[in-house]
Design a protein with these regions (language model features):
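Conserved binding/catalytic microenvironments
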Residues: 90-402
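Short alpha-helical DNA-recognition segment
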Residues: 1-19
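Short, conserved catalytic or interaction motifs in soluble domains
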Residues: 22
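Compositionally biased, long intrinsically disordered regions
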Residues: 41-99
């Protein structure tokens, strides 16, 4: 559907709609409500999840192509992240604790696969499970209300994971719909920390796509009230790190530094004695160092950024977190090149490209593309490895084209 066609229906000008969709202006509530009605509001999250998964598997165009700031902003409207009355369908048997555990085991399996192999691997399998087994559970009857809430929470985590995998594979409009659905499922479960977890992913996406104001709104929503207050220390640290990322993107370096300090304190408070959700298994000292390095790099502190990227590389378990390890190495190489040490940068980039072999991820593709462009810009350098590294990056991109 073209902008002109949308403009005829909603009675906003094409230029106004373009501003809304690019994030240059915040869409008013009536525009957001119209987008949701026209392109698929999520009044019943279970039905929405089933429809979304079916459309995803069949690769249908179930949303206007591209990221829409209006859709992500809609989750911040009053009443959006609230449970909605539903009629629960019948089931062959009661859904119990073992069923919840099964969903969580699947979530853990595919989360770890995503960390190693990237979001381009296995998403269809997760969607099939989500829209058959899990939707069946959500439409079932439960042994008690605690089990019901736990099942909705598990389903929300799985929907979030599918969204994260799509985000990682540069399928941003798909990711956005899953994230929005996950917030509604989390609300049905009355799971405030999980809602915050999904909102910080949406903030991350908005920032990466060049919508800093939208990213900051979502990040601030993720650390508001019970979403942050009732989260475990490790999850609070994750929420605060993305909040810092958003503040940095909004050119508020002092506020970003304070948020990073809070994240560091939260992570230090995490311990084996404090229960925490399995979904935060990936967030560690290496993750915090990576985000701190990004903030320092963006603020122009190349020496500080290099030190933090190096710390992240040392602390991360590379085999279990292959994708992020490769990305961190790529970023470190770029900082080293900016510092004028092309020989060291080439060695680091070579390690990054070796690490990302077999990883199907938009983020590793972006790193490889940046490496190729950087080496091309220095093709006349006396550094012997420069052209070899550029060729290696081109080979990765050719082998992992989407």
């Amino acid at each position: 559907m073209s902008l002109a066609a949308v403009a005829r229906e909603i009675h906003y000008s094409k230029s106004a709609l373009a501003y809304f969709e690019t994030g240059e202006r915040t869409p008013p509530p009536d525009a957001i409500a119209w987008y949701e009605k026209r392109f698929g509001g999520l009044k019943d999250p279970v039905a929405a999840l089933a429809d979304l998964g079916k459309a995803d598997v069949e690769r249908r165009t179930f949303l206007r192509a591209g990221y829409s700031t209006a859709l992500s902003a809609s989750v911040l409207l009053p009443g959006w992240i609230d449970p909605s009355p539903r009629t629960v369908g019948g089931a062959v048997r009661n859904i119990g604790r073992a069923d919840v555990s099964a969903v969580r085991e699947v979530m853990s399996l595919f989360s770890r696969m995503d960390q190693r192999m990237g979001g381009g691997h296995g998403r269809t399998a997760v969607v099939q499970y989500l829209t058959t087994e899990v939707v069946g559970y959500l439409n079932g009857t439960y042994t008690d209300n605690t089990v019901r809430n736990d099942m909705f929470s598990a389903a929300a985590e799985l929907a979030y994971l599918v969204g994260w995998m799509a985000f990682d594979n540069d399928e941003h409009h798909v990711a956005q719909r899953y994230f929005s659905t996950a917030t509604k499922l989390a609300a049905e479960a009355d799971d405030a920390p999980l809602t915050g977890h999904v909102l910080r992913a949406m903030a991350h996406q908005a920032i990466d796509l060049g919508h800093p104001e939208e990213g900051l709104r979502l990040a601030e929503a993720s650390v508001t009230g019970a979403r942050y207050r009732t989260a475990s220390p490790r999850e609070r640290a994750l929420l605060k790190v993305v909040h810092a990322k958003a503040l940095s993107a909004a050119r508020r370096p002092a506020d970003a530094a304070r948020a990073l300090l809070t994240a560091e304190q939260d992570l230090a408070a995490a311990s084996a004695q404090i229960p925490e959700p399995a979904r935060v298994f990936f967030f560690s000292e290496a993750s915090l160092a990576h985000e701190t390095a990004c903030a320092l790099r963006d603020a122009g502190d190349l020496s500080g950024a290099a030190a933090q990227f190096e710390l992240s590389v040392r602390k991360r378990e590379a085999t279990a977190f292959t994708r992020t390890h490769a990305v961190t190495l790529g970023y470190l190489g770029a900082v080293q090149a900016d510092q004028g040490d092309l020989e060291l940068a080439c060695a680091t980039w070579s390690s990054a490209l070796t690490a990302m072999q077999g990883v199907q991820s938009g983020r590793t593709r972006n790193v490889a593309r940046d490496i190729r462009n950087a080496t091309a810009a220095h093709s006349n350098s006396t550094t012997a490895a420069i052209n070899q590294i550029g060729d290696q990056a081109s080979q990765y991109l050719a082998a992992h084209a989407t």
